[in-house]
Structures are given as structure tokens and as C-alpha cells.
A protein has these predicted regions:
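Short, solvent-exposed cationic patches
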Residues: 152-158
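His/Asp/Glu-enriched, well-ordered alpha-helical/loop segment
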Residues: 17-21, 28-115
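C-terminal cap of metal-dependent C-N hydrolases
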Residues: 84-86, 106-149
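Short, acidic/turn-prone active-site loops that include or flank metal/cofactor-
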Residues: 5-9, 74, 134-135
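Active-site gating loops and adjacent loop-to-helix segments of metal-dependent hydrolytic enzymes
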Residues: 1-29
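Extracytoplasmic/secreted cell-surface and envelope-processing proteins
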Residues: 10-13, 56-59, 121
Length: 158
């Protein structure tokens, strides 16, 4: 959803898209939502991801994709988190080694102050990262303020 949203929903002065590109972007955005909802209704797994090569999509905003999944496809925070972790790992063929916190699996994870089951936006403020057994306390991520402002307009959580 993140890659299609800017061209489909942003003001053309922000996205620098023509009116035709915006109309096409909206068709793609609506199609992604329709396809995801139909697949969910039919029991077909839907994976999530972002595309940081696309304008307004960053390497640090997977939380937005989870939130958009809930906002536009109607899934719960719990299901969005499951999809972004264990289901994605399973679809990628690595669910036996990652994607959930279980004995024998890689224990890569993040720690936040809040509960993402209640508010996915807590994922934007990571307090700690554990990766390959190494703890990174208060990791600093260089963010793009202009992107944050524009994308925040479309998230259901602030």
C-alpha cells in the first residue's frame, strides 16, 4: 500500500504527479486494496512489505504498512502484526527460523514503550533493537521530515 498511496492520494503539488498519473495511481491503490480484501475473504495469504525505491517510502516505515493494512483492508492490529512477522516469514520460506519468538528461532526483535496491539504508531519510536544477539539501545534513524508530514496525513494513528 505504501508505494501506491502517494501517487493515488497525495496532492499533485506534493507528489509532483500529473492529474493523469494521480488518476492511474488511485486505480492501482484501489486495486491493491480490493485484491487484498478479496484474498483475505478467500483465505489466500497476503504478505506485506514496502518498496523503498518508490517516492515517499522509507526504510524505516514498515509500521505504516501495518497501519495502512488495518485502515484500508479492515484487519486488526494483531493480524497486521502477525502478517508483517510470522506470515511474511512463512511466505518467504523462513518461518521455521524467524518471524516469531520461539525456542530455536532467531530472536531478532524491537522494543517499544507502548503496545502495538493497541496503537501501531508506537512502532515508529523504537527503544531497542536486538539483532543476532546484539542489543542496540535507542537506535537513531535519520528520518525525512517532509515525508513524515505527508505520510502522517493518511495513517489512522498519529
Amino acid at each position: 500500500l505504501c508505494p501506491a498511496l502517494p501517487y493515488g492520494l497525495f496532492d499533485c503539488q506534493v507528489s509532483h504527479a500529473t492529474k493523469e498519473q494521480k488518476a492511474n495511481g488511485k486505480v492501482v491503490f484501489d486495486g491493491v486494496i480490493e485484491m487484498a480484501k478479496e484474498n483475505l475473504a478467500q483465505g489466500v495469504p497476503v504478505g506485506l512489505g514496502t518498496d523503498t525505491a518508490c517516492p515517499f517510502v522509507t526504510q524505516y516505515d514498515m509500521w505504516r504498512e501495518l497501519d495502512f493494512y488495518g485502515k484500508y483492508c479492515g484487519v486488526s492490529n494483531a493480524f497486521a502484526l502477525y502478517t508483517g512477522t510470522l506470515l511474511n516469514a512463512t511466505l518467504a520460506g523462513v518461518g521455521d527460523v524467524t518471524g516469531s519468538i520461539e525456542v530455536g528461532k532467531c530472536a531478532d526483535m524491537i522494543v517499544t514503550k507502548g503496545n502495538p496491539l493497541e496503537d501501531l504508531s508506537v512502532l515508529r519510536h523504537v527503544e531497542m533493537v536486538v539483532k543476532d544477539g546484539v542489543i542496540y539501545d535507542h537506535p537513531q534513524v535519520k528520518k525525512i521530515p517532509e515525508v513524515e508530514v505527508e505520510m502522517d496525513k493518511f495513517n489512522r494513528v498519529k
